[in-house]
A protein has these predicted regions:
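Short, intrinsically disordered, charge-balanced linker/junction segments flanking boundaries
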Residues: 237-242
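Glycine/tryptophan-enriched, flexible segments
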Residues: 54-232
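Trp/Phe/Arg-rich N-terminal binding region typifying the photolyase-homology
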Residues: 1-84, 190
């Protein structure tokens, strides 16, 4: 589908995701496309292409990026007044009529059967995705729970002590730039700690992965983790959960 569109598109803009197989997919598309292919870092306030180095401790990443982070964290997205013509060409796939095919529960299951989805993994019905739900979840946390984040975040039994927005960031339902900008405007100790987790510990990992050619290799783990792993390799494991 992407290859078909790349032959008629004026420009391809995609998410910068620095892990195989996505990196190779983008390279293949760029080689065959007849138009520019642009990757945009939608994960980090400090773009991976701007820093993109590996440092062995989060506090070193914090110090190395302090000036850039201060400049970018409260920077709003530029507003562009652009009118894009609607695509009316032939589609290289069979489109889904959401109102007719997804609204009906039987048709919905028929669509799922056609997808490459493991049916033995059951959905978590109480969790919903999408931009609207994610924005509402962030707003609730911002209004009611951010003020107590530094005190409650380490209590695993407290479901409201943290934002629970990792999935929203991962699947692109919610921009971490928006969250960072709005949390930064609060200016409290809890907001500062939340930003520390969001912008230091989280982005430190993204930049490390971007900098290495072997992101899945165990050598990316710290020495203490590898040592612990090796020391317990012979431990009995009657059940392997994988």
């Amino acid at each position: 589908v992407v290859k078909s569109f790349s032959n008629s598109a004026s420009c391809i803009i995609t998410d910068l995701f620095p892990l195989p197989p996505w990196t190779q997919w983008v390279k293949n598309t760029a080689q065959s496309a007849t138009c520019p292919v642009i990757e945009v870092d939608c994960h980090c306030v400090i773009p991976m292409t701007l820093f993109g180095k590996s440092v062995d401790r989060p506090f070193k990443f914090r110090d190395a990026t302090k000036k850039m982070r201060k400049r970018l964290v409260q920077q709003s997205w530029p507003e562009n007044d652009i009118t894009v013509p609607k695509y009316d060409g032939e589609l290289p796939f069979n489109p889904v009529d959401v109102e007719k095919q997804v609204a009906n529960i039987e048709n919905r299951y028929k669509l799922l059967v056609d997808c490459s989805i493991d049916p033995t993994v059951f959905p978590i019905w109480r969790e919903r995705g999408g931009e609207v739900v994610s924005l509402a979840k962030w707003q609730r946390f911002l209004d009611k729970n951010l003020s107590s984040y530094s005190r409650r975040r380490n209590d695993a039994a407290d479901p409201k002590g943290v934002s629970r927005l990792s999935a929203a960031f991962h699947y692109g339902f919610l921009s971490p730039m928006k969250v960072a900008r709005e949390a930064s405007a609060v200016g409290t100790k809890s907001a500062e700690k939340y930003l520390d987790e969001l912008l230091i510990f989280r982005e430190h990992a993204w930049h490390h992965v971007f900098s290495t050619d072997t992101p899945y290799c165990s050598s990316n783990l710290p020495h203490w983790a590898i040592e612990s792993w090796n020391n317990t390799s012979d431990d009995p494991r009657p059940v392997i959960l994988s």
